[in-house]
Amino acid sequence: MIPEASYDVVVVGAGPAGSTAAMYAAKNGASVLLLDKKREIGSPIQCAGFLPDASEVQALLREAMLPDTLKNYPDSCVLQRIDNQRIFTPNCNIKEFAVRGAVLDRCRYDQFLAEQAARAGAELMIKTRVTKIEGTTVETSGVFGKYRIKAKAIIGADGPNSLVAKSKGLALTSGSRETRLLSNTR
């Protein structure tokens, strides 16, 4: 028999979006389970790790409430601070523009965020793959065994090939720009 558990919120994917969502849910009193299939949070690295300065983001999205995770992170996560970006296009054009930000060590940053979620009260299970989602039940398999987990809310932060999105009819399709934008937010 597969053991059962119950949480207010199950977050699938412990990248920046998933760990931040788990942290805020836990801070607001929810029982939270944060799941990630990887052996080590942040590895393998999923992207280059550029993070614009919070003031740059706030200037673009004036009414947005930015999470603390975009504003406050340890210097140990910063590989380099920058104030200028240069982009080389495929046809060898160069675009340069001023933008303040930091290049982060994504492995350290992702681990920092997962630690913040755990400190806020979220439970973290790594090496755990989501095998099925049916309604509000998440089935997992991993080093902790197989579980059936009931959740009041399921947050899919599991990337562009999201099992959560597929289970909710939001799978990535080539014809839908809205779905593509939604699915690529991490």
Curated annotation (Swiss-Prot):
Pfam families: FAD_binding_3 (PF01494). Gene3D superfamilies: FAD/NAD(P)-binding domain. It comes from the Archaea. InterPro entries: FAD-bd (IPR002938), FAD/NAD-bd_sf (IPR036188), Geranylgeranyl_reductase (IPR050407). One of its GO terms (molecular function) is FAD binding. Belongs to the geranylgeranyl reductase family. ChlP subfamily. This is Uncharacterized protein in nifH2 5'region.
